[in-house]
Amino acid sequence: MKKVIVYIDGSNFYFSVKSRFNVKLDIEKFCAKLTKDKNLACIKYYIAPIDQFSNPNMYAKQQSFFDNLREIKNLQIIFGRLEKRKKDGEEYYVEKATDVNLALDLVLDAQSNSYDEAYLISNDGDFSGAVKASVERFNKKIVYVAIGNKKSISYHLKNVSSKTLNIDEKFISDLKIE
């Protein structure tokens, strides 16, 4: 049975699902449905935590979300960070290290033979180099899980992945959280 790891770009996943379907999904059931008859070894969820002092309400909601994630068997949360920036007097945050962590794990896990097949849940074309290396150098099957409309789906990921799986309303119909 093929050993599978699911890699989730958390922020990208959240905003893609929200903009496309305007729902919250049960991540455990979503990953199980994606990988159905395969050996799901691990789910890796990459995210940058919100600073508790900059936005206490969002921080509390995110911590509750993390607590729910920690209940999922074989799920690892890999944290990046948020860096505060200022432009034209306005403060905003930029997510750092999450994409690099995911790309590194995808390639290093391929090299160490931790998976036969990986599912990448992100529309970020910056992952195309890591996907290409995993497919070509380590002979791994990488499934690009595309969530969104045709504009948001990454042409670069589609080109280098072994397979593209477009998520539609029908796929998620039984995975919604109220």
Residue ranges and their predicted role:
Residues 1-94, 137, 141, 148:
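Domain-level signal for Mg2+-assisted phosphodiester chemistry and nucleotide/NA-binding surfaces
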Residues 71, 76-178:
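Nuclease catalytic cores that cleave nucleic-acid phosphodiester bonds
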